Amino acid sequence: MQYGAAAAEQAWYMPAAAMVVAAAAETAAERVERLASESAVVVFSVSSCCMCHAVKRLFCGMGVHPAVHELDLDPRGRDLERALARLVGAGGAAAAAVPVVFIGGKLVGAMDRVMAAHINGSLVPLLKEAGALWL
């Protein structure tokens, strides 16, 4: 499946039913990869998770407005949670898998990694490199 400009060029003539079938054929891992690359900062979250709320507030407080994907509101959210748990090494424990943050399309990790990067000063350069911060 193609993404980005190539997909947009082809989408104009693809029937809606074919787009739905193509989206359904996309695996959870492929969907995570696609969503993670669509914005400078992407947060996979669960709306009732306090750690997810904290990481979103951290970014907003820095002037960064991430793309947030609330997995509990997504019909395929459970599959995405499992794929994210595998990515961050949570051993399939979906509760431990969120929040998951991508910056510049690259996996930063869960809350512990984001906070460690913030504390050690490496978060701001990552955000600048991804184009999420200008100052």
UniProtKB/Swiss-Prot annotation:
Check the record and name the Pfam families matching this protein.
Answer: Glutaredoxin
Q: Which InterPro entries does this chain map to?
A: GlrX-like_pln_2, Glutaredoxin, Thioredoxin-like_sf
Family, as annotated: Belongs to the glutaredoxin family. CC-type subfamily.
At which positions is motif Responsive for interaction with TGA factors?
A: 132-135
Its recorded name reads: Glutaredoxin-C5
- Please give the PROSITE patterns that the UniProt record associates with this protein: GLUTAREDOXIN_2
Q: What is the lineage of its organism?
A: Eukaryota, Viridiplantae, Streptophyta, Embryophyta, Tracheophyta
Q: Where in the cell is it found?
A: Cytoplasm; Nucleus
Keyword list (alphabetical) reads: Cytoplasm, Disulfide bond, Electron transport, Nucleus, Redox-active center, Transport
Any single Gene Ontology cellular-component annotation: cytoplasm
Indicate the principal place this protein occupies in or around the cell: cytoplasm
Q: What does this protein do?
A: Has a glutathione-disulfide oxidoreductase activity in the presence of NADPH and glutathione reductase. Reduces low molecular weight disulfides and proteins.
Record domain Glutaredoxin: where:
29-134
